[in-house]
Amino acid sequence: MALDFSNATVKAWRRENGRVGVRNHVLILPVDDISNAACEAVANNVKGTLAIPHAYGRLQFGEDLELHFRTIIGTGANPNVAAVVVIGIEPEWTQVIVDGIAKTGKPVTGFSIEQKGDFETIRQAGWKAKEYVHWASELQKEDCPISDLWISTKCGESDTTTGLSSCPTVGNMYDKLLPQGIYGCFGETSEITGAEHICEKRAANPETARKFKEIWQAYSDDVIFAHQTDDLSDSQPTKGNILGGLTTIEEKALGNLEKIGRTSTYIDAMGPAETPSKGPGLYFMDSSSAAAECVTLMAAGGYVIHTFPTGQGNVVGNPIVPVIKISGNPRTLRTMSEHIDVDVTGVLTREMTIDQAGDALIEMIIRTANGRMTAAEALGHREFSMTKLYRSA
C-alpha cells in the first residue's frame, strides 16, 4: 500500500518572495569569466560563502546573451540562495544581474572590477560577504508543506535498467506529488527524439502541445536536418548507453518519458532557464541532455531539488541544488554505491514495486529538504555548466 504524503511537511527557509528554499547559500557570483578569480578569492576568505566560476560572459549578444543573463540571474534568485555578492568586470552588466536578483527581495550587492582592480574589489566584496554570512546564519527554518517544493528531473548514464526502474520511480513520485501542488520540470530535448509524438500528446492543452512541437522541431532542424544525419557521433545515444543496452535514441526517449509518470500532463513548454509562470504543475524545459548543463538550467529556472535516475552511474552535482541519485542497476550499486541516494534494485528483482520505489524517493526528498546531504553534495560535486547558443563576437 502506498504511503500517504498529503500532510507531509519539510523544514525549510521561507524567502522574501514566499518561495521555499532547502539550502541557505551565500553566493559569490561572477558575471563573466574574468571575474572568477576575484569571486574565488572572496569565497576563500569568507567561510560560509560559495563561488560559482564559469567560462562565459564576454562579447555575447542576442539570444545567447539573454540566456546568459537569465541563467546567472536565475541562479542567484533560486530560493536555495539566501544572499548574493555579484562581481563583474564592468558596472553595466553587473548591475543588470543585481537588478534581476533584487526582484526576489533577497539581499544582493554588486561590485565591478574596472577602475578598482582585484585587491580593492576583493576587500569591499569580502566585507559585504561577511555581513551576509552573519545574517544568513541566523535565518530560521520553518515547517512548510511539501507542496511548496519545486522538483526537477533529468536522467544520465542510462541503460536498460533505467527505463524499467529508476525513471518510472520518478514518474511515480510526480504522479503522487503534482496533485498536491508542487512544481515539476523535465526536459532533455534531444533525448525525446523518436518519442516526440508521445510527448506532444502528454501536453495539458493544444497551446502547450504546439509550443513543445515548435521547440522539438527547432532542435530537429538545427541538428538532424541541418547536418542531414540522425547520427550524433556517439552522443545520442552515448557509448555508455549502447554498452548498457540502449542501442537507439528511440529506446532512450521512451525511458526518458517514464520520468513524467502515468497520469501527469505538462502545462507549459519553456525556454532554457525560464521560470514557470502558469502556477503549480509539470513543465517541459527546452534543455541540453548533458547532465551539468541541464541541471544548471533547471536550477536557474527556480527548482530547489533535482531527482536524477541513473543506470550505469553518473556523478554530477550542482553548487546550489541537491541532486538525488536513483538507480536500479545492481552492478552500479556494487561499484558506485557512494554516488547513489535511493536504491531501487528491488524493482528488477521483484522485491519492490514501482509504487514502493516512488514512496522511497519521496521519503528521500523529504529528508533532503530537511537537510540531509545528497551523495553528490557529500562528495563535493558542484558542476555548473552554462549553455551557449552560438560563438561570441
Curated annotation (Swiss-Prot):
InterPro entries, per database record: GD_AH_C, GD_AH_second, UxaA_altronate/galactarate_dh
Keyword Lyase: yes
Primary location group: cytoplasm
Propeptide positions: 1-2
The keyword Aminoacyl-tRNA synthetase belongs to this UniProt entry's keyword annotation: no
Catalysed reactions, as listed in the record: (2R)-3-sulfolactate = sulfite + pyruvate + H(+)
Any one GO CC term of the record: cytoplasm
GO molecular function, one term: sulfolactate sulfo-lyase activity
Compartments, record wording: Cytoplasm
GO biological process, one term: D-galacturonate catabolic process
Sorted UniProt keywords: Cytoplasm, Lyase
E.C. designation(s): 4.4.1.24
Enzyme class: lyase
Family, similarity comment: Belongs to the UxaA family.
Oligomer and partners: (2R)-sulfolactate sulfo-lyase is composed of a SuyA and a SuyB subunit.
Function: Together with SuyA, desulfonates sulfolactate to pyruvate and sulfite.
Protein known as: (2R)-sulfolactate sulfo-lyase subunit beta
Organism: Paracoccus pantotrophus
Gene: suyB
